[in-house]
């Protein structure tokens, strides 16, 4: 199942980077638990359910950024847990460029993401979200 999890999440990052949010949400359990660290005007706290992630997290991105990608460098397969290490690359509405390294920790069950934690480089993340 873990190879399937890596493939699923690789496809999910590709969908996110082309702004195909319906395809991203297909990889999530409807009751996914989601955590964002905040910083600047970035979403912060715990979100419950795919609909909340779409409405309260993803929908804020185009309000602040003209470009925004989560580019994975590698995937660490831990069976039901998957760690994705990479960097956010973005350009704010004000033209500020952001690059912030991340480690995303996913928990998977039956081929769907059931939880997500965004561990991100704090200073550039907060600065990027404040520069819109």
Placement of each model-derived feature along the sequence:
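Short, low-complexity N-terminal intrinsically disordered segments enriched in polar/charged residues
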Residues: 1-31, 128-132
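Alpha-helical structural motif
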Residues: 5-8, 20, 53, 57, ...
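Short, mixed-charge, low-aromatic patches
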Residues: 9-18, 41-44, 60-62, 85
């Amino acid at each position: 199942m873990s190879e399937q999890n890596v493939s699923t999440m690789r496809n999910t990052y590709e969908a996110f980077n082309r702004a195909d949010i319906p395809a991203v949400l297909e990889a999530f359990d409807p009751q996914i638990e989601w955590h964002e660290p905040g910083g600047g005007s970035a979403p912060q706290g715990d979100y419950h359910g795919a609909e909340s992630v779409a409405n309260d997290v993803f929908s804020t991105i185009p309000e602040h950024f003209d470009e925004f990608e989560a580019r994975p460098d590698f995937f660490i397969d831990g069976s039901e847990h998957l760690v994705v290490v990479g960097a956010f690359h973005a350009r704010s509405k004000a033209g500020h460029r952001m690059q912030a390294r991340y480690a995303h920790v996913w928990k998977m069950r039956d081929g769907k993401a059931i939880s997500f934690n965004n561990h991100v480089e704090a200073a550039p993340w907060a600065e990027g979200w404040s520069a819109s």
